[in-house]
Regions:
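SH3-family beta-barrel domains
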Residues: 20-47, 58-62, 69-74, 79-84, ...
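N-terminal signal peptide c-region/cleavage motif recognized by signal peptidases
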Residues: 15-17
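A short, aromatic/hydrophobic, helix- or strand-capping loop or linear motif
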Residues: 51
């Protein structure tokens, strides 16, 4: 049930816009864009790909989901759940997929992706959940 719940959360609650780079390969040889998450509870967001660039802000939520949209050496340009774009150091990212509830208030989680499905949980804003398995017809 946890697997399905995580997949439903991913489908319903965290859909980032697809970049124009769709299908391109980055410096790493992996396709762009792709999903990742923040590895640490403190991650510096920089204005460019290098430590010489100023810190714009600091992410303070471990496992928060992000979309990698560009690569340069050991730096990754990411888009976060609010649509902000910045650069982070590659070791601060994880390939594990997590989702983040971004609806204000409490939202329902359903047993199946159908309009008449049973509500199995209530989730509050800013809750993070691990994606254990995606539905076969979806790729997140």
């Amino acid at each position: 049930m946890k697997t399905f719940l995580s997949a439903v959360l991913a489908v319903c609650l965290f859909a980032l816009p697809v970049s124009a780079q769709n299908g391109d390969d980055g410096d790493s040889g992996r396709s762009l864009p792709r999903m990742a998450s923040l590895r640490s509870k403190l991650v510096n967001a920089r204005s460019g790909p290098g430590s010489r660039y100023p810190i714009e802000w600091v992410y303070k939520q471990k496992n928060a989901p992000v979309e990698i949209i560009a690569e340069f050496d050991l730096w990754r340009q990411i888009r976060d759940w609010e649509g902000s774009e910045t650069w982070v150091y590659k070791p601060m990212l994880s390939s594990q997929r997590w989702i983040k509830m971004t609806n204000k208030g409490t939202s329902s989680i359903y047993a199946k992706p159908e309009h008449d499905a049973k509500v199995i949980a209530k989730v509050e804003d800013q809750v993070i959940g691990k994606v254990e398995k995606c539905p076969e017809d979806k790729d997140f």
